[in-house]
């Protein structure tokens, strides 16, 4: 009898371990990224760039530059620089990061200053109904994002459609 009890306990431990591993794996896929920089670079990994070193321009907020550089993926070739709204038209930035403008201002800038392919990302546009193509927002202990399909189309940057699944996953993560 003791043999069968030990065998049963070992079996139960294995089942509990497998359930725990499965639970942890599912959480790792659904948990939002921990900061705006990781979330931004995760999104950018789904983009197809016409250059090997895309230019990421932070609009009107040079204080974020050091954090973007520190959080950039190890083998990335992003050229990260601050620019003002007045410099956008001549910047030819492939990525525009907005952090302190309204959605209305973002949309105006995209319509009036950007006449080249550029992907726009904002962490100050929670509704994401106009303005940037990708809108980051705080969710629980991390960040999630929404996608504005009109702005994404306007960006003229090819994005792998799997990013839509990532957005849906980040939206539904508890």
Positions of predicted regions on the chain:
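Bacterial N-terminal signal peptides
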Residues: 18-24
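Short hydrophobic alpha-helices and adjacent helix-cap/hinge residues
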Residues: 10-13, 29-174
């Amino acid at each position: 009898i003791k043999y069968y009890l030990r065998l049963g306990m070992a079996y139960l431990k294995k089942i509990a371990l497998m359930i725990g591993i499965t639970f942890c794996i599912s959480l790792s896929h659904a948990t939002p990224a921990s900061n705006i920089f990781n979330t931004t670079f995760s999104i950018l990994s789904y983009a197809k760039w016409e250059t090997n070193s895309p230019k990421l321009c932070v609009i009107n907020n040079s204080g974020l530059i050091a954090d973007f550089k520190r959080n950039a993926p190890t083998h990335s070739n992003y050229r990260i620089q601050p620019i003002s709204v007045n410099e956008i038209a001549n910047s030819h930035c492939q990525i525009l990061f907005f952090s302190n403008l309204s959605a209305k201002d973002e949309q105006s800038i995209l319509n009036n200053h950007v006449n080249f392919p550029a992907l726009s990302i904002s962490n100050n546009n929670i509704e994401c109904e106009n303005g940037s193509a990708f809108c980051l927002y705080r969710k629980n202990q991390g960040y999630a994002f929404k996608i504005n399909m009109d702005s994404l189309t306007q960006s003229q940057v090819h994005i792998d459609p799997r990013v839509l699944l990532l957005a849906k996953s980040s939206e539904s993560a508890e």
